[in-house]
Design a protein with these regions (language model features):
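A short, N-terminal "cap"/entry segment at the start of jelly-roll beta-barrel domains
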Residues: 1-53
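N-terminal regulatory/effector-sensing and dimerization cores
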Residues: 40-120
Length: 120
């Protein structure tokens, strides 16, 4: 996999903003919030295999939101399958909640609003 983004060499006060831009560039238009944006760390590695994109992501605790405004831009129409290697991921979509922890995957639709709670 090729590293396409890292906060490592970015000034601490600018890391979270840069991370949000990277999410929008490499995934989907979203909003995100961090409890500690001045001490944010993350990286994104990516491989493209035909129509499938595989990525490895390390991210600090945060909440990610995709709403109707983002979807109206329809930058991508796809599904995401996430397999956390540590921590947990809570996905809220269509009135349902799914929790993913190491060893358990979660699937969600990018064409519908969602809220992801990413916890280390």
């Amino acid at each position: 996999m090729k590293n396409v983004f890292s906060t490592q060499n970015i000034e601490k006060t600018k890391r979270f903003s840069a991370w949000q831009e990277a999410l929008c560039e490499h995934y989907l238009k979203v909003d995100s919030r961090s409890q500690n944006p001045t001490d944010y760390e993350g990286f994104l590695n990516k491989s493209i295999l035909g129509p499938v994109i595989l990525s490895e992501v390390f991210l600090s605790t945060q909440d990610i939101f995709r709403n109707h405004h983002h979807i109206a831009l329809l930058d991508k129409d796809c599904f995401y399958i996430m397999f956390p290697s540590k921590g947990s991921l809570l996905v809220e979509q269509a009135g349902k909640q799914q929790v993913s922890t190491p060893g358990a995957a979660v699937l969600f639709d990018a064409a519908m609003p969602y809220h992801l709670q990413c916890r280390n």
